[in-house]
A protein has these predicted regions:
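Bacterial N-terminal signal peptides
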Residues: 9-20
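Bacterial N-terminal signal peptides that target proteins for export
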Residues: 1-10
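N-terminus-centered regions that define maturation/targeting leaders and the start
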Residues: 22-205
Length: 205
């Protein structure tokens, strides 16, 4: 009787260990489990940790983005301004990213590069053209189109949107047809003199 009980207990113990091992393996293989997106400012930090002050007449930092700047409204870009970069600044890059997603890369809503060093603001409703009148270039957003595309998170979900500005010691000569977020970030690494950002939240409807 004792031998039967011992064998039964051993069998149960092995089954528990095997089940735990399978559960652990399944969790480790779950796609993007707990993944948080990495923002551009973390991928291309400032060389000297310089700071730009970024502001908007449309919202306070950490505030709420109005419907007019989203796909639930007019889908126009908000006005963005920033302080002048340090000595040696030759151009600016402006990126808008949604970090409220469970994936390695944020959703890219706006890519601007080659912005001249004397330009420190973008007006509301910036045209969705590859080249702007001020000389800046607009790369590809999440829709693979030039210019700003507004937020449209799932209904009931609040997502943060980061407007990041980078002062560079060079001009990025990139074809607008290929200038997506990843390409611009790769090109500006090691050339960022200063950066700053402002964020706003929006809840899907």
């Amino acid at each position: 009787m004792k031998r039967v009980i011992t064998r039964t207990a051993l069998t149960l113990a092995l089954a528990v260990v095997s089940t735990a091992s399978l559960n652990t393996q399944a969790q480790s293989q779950a796609p993007n489990a707990g993944t948080e997106p990495v923002l551009a400012k973390e991928l291309a930090p400032a060389r000297s940790y310089g700071k730009l002050t970024v502001t908007s007449a449309a919202f306070q930092s950490g505030g709420t983005l109005e419907d007019k700047y989203t796909q639930n409204g007019d889908n126009v870009s908000p006005p963005i301004s920033w302080s002048r970069g340090p000595a040696g600044t030759m151009s600016y890059v402006v990126l808008t990213e949604d970090s409220g997603v469970n994936r390695p890369d944020p959703i890219s809503h706006w890519v601007i590069y080659y912005s001249p060093s004397n330009v420190t603001a973008l007006p509301e409703n910036t045209p969705t053209e590859a080249k702007l009148e001020n000389g800046a270039m607009q790369g590809l957003n999440v829709r693979k189109a030039a210019g700003f595309v507004g937020p449209k998170p799932p209904a009931g979900q609040m997502h943060p949107y980061h407007f990041e500005v980078f002062a560079l010691n060079k001009r990025l000569n990139i074809d607008p047809a290929t200038a997506d977020r990843a390409t611009v970030i790769a090109a500006m690494k090691g050339h960022v003199l200063a950066l700053g950002d402002i964020s706003a939240n929006y809840t899907g409807k």
